[in-house]
Amino acid sequence: MEQDSNGGSDAGRDYARDLGDEPAPAIRDSAPDFLAPIDADAPVSGHNPPPEPTSSPAESPEQDWSRARDLIYPAFRPVGTQGLDIEAIDRDSLAAHSQQSHAQPLLDVGPAELPVVYTIDAGAYDIVVNGDHLLSWGVEPSDIQDAAMSNLFNWSATAPWTDEVSGDRRLISSDTGAGWDAVRILLPAVLAHLEAELRPAGRILIGLPERHLMTAGSLRPGDDDFATLFADFIVETSGGADEPIDRRVFELVDGRLVEFGGVTSLR
């Protein structure tokens, strides 16, 4: 490259480019045949065509119940979450207004009035089941509930527990990170496990601060400080969570989850 003798420029002339260093252009020796079959391997505007899709959108879980039913799980949401009451939903009414959007989530009521939604596990994210999904699948709300609880049961059967002991105090937690740790408390088998492990030592306190954590501990007679420490932990964990659920402390009483009334409530 040499400096341009005309001056006024910081860039010199590129004689190699001026003289041409590209391949010789292809010159047609005949007119194009517009009726000839298109070469599938020919470049398009200098690029290769995109690959053909391997599946149809109609086969996605959002459209195909046979694919969705093995991917549906329940999930807790904070109190105040709005949606379509799954127990009162009328499929015929939804179908009569099928041209309208029914994007509100199907909403169930869990223990201690905790809202429950249903989600499709899509791997890196979840899809919350709504009224449009119900219409697309052509199933009853009870089918969604049954499938979700069945999938949760199968997962929980092999999911591990974290067991922590400090002196006479003991915590049993589910913190696998799979996304179904908190909602695991819906399963009778889980309630029975906590009863067997923690009831002999005292009352059973339970926290559901966020989606990825369910923790339970024994409140022993005379250890009132444990209840305070447990409550502080739940509030702190829920406050720093990406998907918080509830800051309350619950108690397992007669096989039911109820709001903890304090250390003197059952004395």
What is each of the regions a protein language model found here?
Residues G12-S166:
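Extended, low-hydrophobicity segments enriched in charged/polar residues
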Residues H97-L252, L257-V263, R267:
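A contiguous, surface-oriented mixed alpha/beta subdomain in the mid-to-C-terminal portion of proteins
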